[in-house]
Amino acid sequence: MAESYNICLDIGGTKVLGVVFNSKKEIVFRLKKKTKSGGDSSDNIEQLIISVVKELIEASGIKADKINAIAAGAPGVINQETGVVLFSPNLPWRNYNIKKPIEKEFGCPFYIGNDVNVGVLGEYKYGAAKGYKNVVGLFVGTGMGGGLILNGELFTGNKFKAAEYGHMILDPEGPLCNCGQRGCLEAFSSKQ
């Protein structure tokens, strides 16, 4: 059976990290590119993602038709089923379907979820939370987010906002957060 590959992306407010995995879950190649700060457009971020994936394919020496799927984690409220980023405080995405253009470009399935949900799911399946039925994760970076595993299942809530701890308002007169509110936990404790 011929070797096949998956590409995973961590799309953040300051960088896009891409990794190619083979069918044995071994890292074949990794790449990191900076995202521009400030008002970069949705189309520019989309083009950056496409260029990172193309560079990963070329630099790793694999053929594009050997890619099974591309998966990504990104900050914000994301409908995992449709691939629509409803809101991202650290990227210029509002009701933006990133799934369609990536699938069109590469001809393989593209999956996207909230970056912290994806991270907590990874810890649950392969890392520090392996073997636990219920897991709470809190990740701090450019922003701050949480993820929940309840009874062995990722819990996102009915509006994909479960565990958005970073946007709990601690002080209504506090510093302005990237989400537009004042006094969010994220505004006090993240790298934003």
Specify the residue positions occupied by each region the protein language model found.
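Acidic active-site catalytic centers that drive phospho-/nucleotidyl reactions
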Residues: 10-12, 22, 79, 115, ...
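Glycine/GP-enriched mid-protein hinge/lid loop-to-helix segment characteristic of carbohydrate kinases
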Residues: 3-5, 19-21, 29-32, 41-42, ...
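A conserved beta-strand/loop capping segment in the N-terminal third of enzymes
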Residues: 25, 73-74
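Short glycine-rich, Thr/Ser-proximal phosphate-binding strand/loop in the N-terminal lobe
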Residues: 2-47, 51, 84-87, 160
